[in-house]
Design a protein with these regions (language model features):
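An acidic-aromatic loop/edge-strand motif
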Residues: 1-25, 52, 67-75, 81-155, ...
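Active-site-adjacent substrate/metal-binding segments within catalytic domains
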Residues: 20, 29-31, 150-153, 166-168, ...
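Generic detection of short hydrophobic beta-strand segments and adjacent strand-loop junctions
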Residues: 32, 36, 81, 85, ...
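Aromatic-lined ligand-binding clefts that engage carbohydrates, nucleic acids, or primary amines
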Residues: 33-62, 94, 156-183, 210-214
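Short, solvent-exposed secondary-structure boundary motifs
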Residues: 47, 145-147, 189
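Solvent-exposed beta-strand/loop surfaces of large extracellular or lumenal domains
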Residues: 53, 58-80, 179-197
């Protein structure tokens, strides 16, 4: 990777692209397994994300696919490719081919998106059916790489708002921020100690639905995965290490995210 440790002066590195001949291309293949318990609808939903699509031809199980115009993941450098129609239970292969080597043609991760979970196997993870349906770590619920939001809802019956204050408290959660909604309306954020939010003004007499949406981060999406996460700073050097053989997904270093215990509604008499 010439971009990790080099400094571009004018066009010094970009001009090296002229050194590559027309027949200097290469290909890289990514193999993954799909568990038979993944239903057809979920399999059809799967999309692949390949960076810099202008440099590659993309194939899934030997079938060439094109990016979906206007469909991006995270930002415009991450276009999506609909690949679900060419997938099957068992082993699948996504291949990128460069007809000519290019100075920007780095072999980077390819991402798979869709309505599925993953389970550890001997080498990494296997795509499977299922979704989060309980409290606890996203890692243990089949979404170890998920970075977005999971909503947790509870109903509370309120009798007597006068001279009372009500706070939502998250006693045990892992995430970057939690959004709180009362009866479908935003009530505020929880992001630091004491992990509580006054929602008195959002409540009504009787039944109230309270939802906490916990947000993860891109750390578990982009990695790194093969060494401990305890360092206080991360940089390009953090990706320099990889084991000799692909480890089981159960050995990946991943951060905990999720709501570990039910949130509480604390009533305080004024």
């Amino acid at each position: 990777n010439p971009w990790q440790h080099k400094i571009q002066y004018k066009k010094t590195w970009l001009e090296m692209d002229t050194l590559f001949k027309d027949n200097s291309g290469f290909e890289a293949s990514y193999h993954f397994n799909i568990n038979p318990n993944l239903d057809a609808t979920a399999m059809q939903s799967i999309r692949a994300v390949v960076e810099r699509p202008e440099l590659w031809k993309v194939f899934i199980n030997g079938n060439e696919v094109s990016k979906t115009e206007g469909s991006f993941w995270i930002e415009k450098s991450f276009p999506q490719f609909s690949v679900g129609e060419f997938l099957k239970p068992g082993k699948n292969t996504l291949t990128i081919k460069a007809l000519r080597m290019h100075i920007l043609a780095e072999v980077m991760p390819v991402y798979l998106l869709g309505d599925f979970s993953v389970v550890p196997n001997d080498k990494g993870f296997e795509i499977a059916g299922g979704n989060i349906d309980t409290l606890g770590s996203w890692k243990e619920n089949g979404l170890p790489f998920y970075s977005q939001k999971v909503a947790y809802s509870q109903n509370f019956n309120i009798s007597g708002l006068e001279n009372m204050a009500y706070k939502v408290k998250l006693p045990n959660w892992k995430g970057t921020v939690a959004e709180v909604f009362v009866n479908g309306q935003p009530a505020g954020l929880i992001a630091w100690q004491p992990n509580e939010l006054d929602i008195t003004s959002s409540l009504k007499e009787g039944e109230n639905e309270i939802t906490a949406k916990v947000t993860g981060s891109l750390k578990n999406t982009f990695g790194f995965f093969y060494q401990n996460n305890d360092n206080w700073i991360f940089g390009p050097h953090s990706w320099n290490y990889a084991p000799e053989k692909a480890p089981s997904g159960s050995e990946y270093f991943l951060m905990e995210y999720g709501l570990m215990e039910p949130f509480e509604l604390v009533a305080v008499k004024l």
